[in-house]
From Swiss-Prot:
It comes from Aspergillus terreus (strain NIH 2624 / FGSC A1156). Residues 32-55 have a biased composition (Pro residues). Belongs to the peptidase C14B family. GO terms for cellular component: cytoplasm. The active site is at residues 194, 250. Keywords: Apoptosis, Hydrolase, Protease, Thiol protease, Zymogen. This is Metacaspase-1A. It is an enzyme of class 3 (hydrolase). Residues 1-93 are annotated as: Disordered.
Length: 403
């Protein structure tokens, strides 16, 4: 399959009855209290060995933890992984002092946006994408306390024009998802449909291409680029607000443009914050974090002067894409691979969302690295792709995965 920007497709293949959503919905009252929203008990002691990551090197104490070699046999004798710390955590790795991020405890409000596009009647029609988001929305509702009224589903089988996954509706819904979000909220974004690449205009992608998603009306309205998704859904978030994203599409490896990327082999990519701090790119951010507006103005002016000399595309527009919020993204394969789709139990299903649900159903209490390995094991039974986890901040992969 070729990979110019309009023909790299990932999607599903198995019919699904086009019945309205309402029919199979029982009455949804308040979700029963479940362990996901419980903060740790007041006298909870974090197990030893979970301190903040050492500054300087990678995050893993004494090399990668055992799950990297041994699938899910979690070595270390802790009954379960530690919950996320409640205090701000320094970015480290050469970032300026005071430049921190915060994990979300995911105890606050929950909102979800799920987009599934089968492209009915178009060239490159898919069959599994609407199914993917129906499965995911049911899973979120039944297991993670996302109320139906706090979820927006955009699928191209709906009669209501506002629920069609057009470019305008998708962008509007992305703004809705993050509006008024607070620390410890848990926002969820799922996209199943065609993805692809387009030549990168601002010089910020390693491979010279931006990742894009294709709304149902892309032939008229055009695609949506990763930079725009980052600007709408990541930039406005406060420290400690979680956004979890899952992409079932081709070329989705960097679809939210997050700078830290992890695989079952360890860290694949991290930004050089010391270098970027030296270029003044983090100066504005850290001054802002300290509330030091005077220095922020002078730093910003110096940075703009430097950028105006047009040192190169990198100097001009590269921001670190780090965020003090808690943004994570699960995607299949690497950017250079295509996302496979196949029949699962007679229905076409997006590989990533299916593996994510399957892995968490088997064991809801996993660390990030355990979950990466579990998802890899699920994918390996049916697919060629490997999972990766991208993050807006350095991630302690031994912490308990919460959502």
């Amino acid at each position: 399959m070729q990979h110019h920007h309009h023909s790299s497709y990932g999607g599903g293949g198995g019919g699904y009855p086009g019945q309205a959503y309402r029919q199979q919905q029982p009455y949804y009252g308040q979700p029963s209290p479940q362990p996901y929203a419980q903060p740790p008990p007041p006298n909870y002691q974090r197990p030893s060995g979970y301190g903040p990551p050492p500054s300087g090197g990678h995050m893993y104490q004494q090399g990668p933890p055992a799950p990297y070699q041994q699938h899910n046999s979690y070595q270390g004798g802790h009954g379960r992984p530690a919950p996320p710390p409640t205090d701000p955590v320094a970015f480290g790795h050469g970032a300026p002092q005071g430049y921190n991020f915060q994990y979300s405890r995911c105890t606050g409000k929950r909102k979800a946006l799920l987009i599934g596009i089968n492209y009915f009647g178009q060239k490159g029609q898919l069959r599994g994408c609407i199914n993917d988001v129906k499965n995911m929305s049911t899973y979120l509702n039944q297991n993670f306390g996302y109320a139906r009224e706090d979820m927006v589903l955009l699928t191209d089988d709906q009669q209501n024009p506002m629920s069609q996954p057009t470019k305008a509706n998708i962008l509007r819904a992305m703004h809705w998802l993050v509006k008024d979000a607070q620390p410890n909220d848990s926002l969820f974004f799922h996209y199943s449909g065609h993805g692809g690449q387009t030549p990168d205009l601002d010089g910020d992608e390693d491979d010279g291409y931006d990742e894009v998603i294709y709304p149902v009306d892309f032939r008229v309205a055009g695609h949506i680029v990763d930079d725009e998704m980052h600007r709408i859904m990541v930039n406005p978030l406060k420290p400690g607000t979680r956004l979890t994203a899952i992409f079932d599409s081709c070329h989705s490896g960097s679809a939210l443009d997050l700078p830290y990327i992890y695989s079952t082999q360890g860290i694949l990519k991290e930004p050089n914050l010391a270098k970027e701090a030296g270029q003044g790119l983090l100066g504005v951010v850290s001054a802002y974090a300290r509330g030091d507006m005077g220095s922020m103005v002078s730093t910003a002016v110096g940075f703009l002067k430097k950028a105006a000399k047009g040192d190169e595309a990198y100097e001009r527009t590269k921001q670190t894409k780090t965020s003090p919020a808690d943004v994570i993204m699960w995607s299949g394969s690497k950017d250079s691979q295509t996302s496979s789709d196949a029949q699962i139990q007679g229905q076409a299903t997006g590989a990533m969302s299916w593996a994510f649900i399957s892995a968490l159903r088997k064991n809801p209490q996993q660390s990030y690295v355990q979950l990466l390995n579990s998802i890899r094991d699920e994918l390996a039974t049916k697919y060629s792709q490997k999972p990766q986890l991208s993050c807006s901040h350095p991630l302690d992969v031994n912490l308990l995965y919460v959502m």
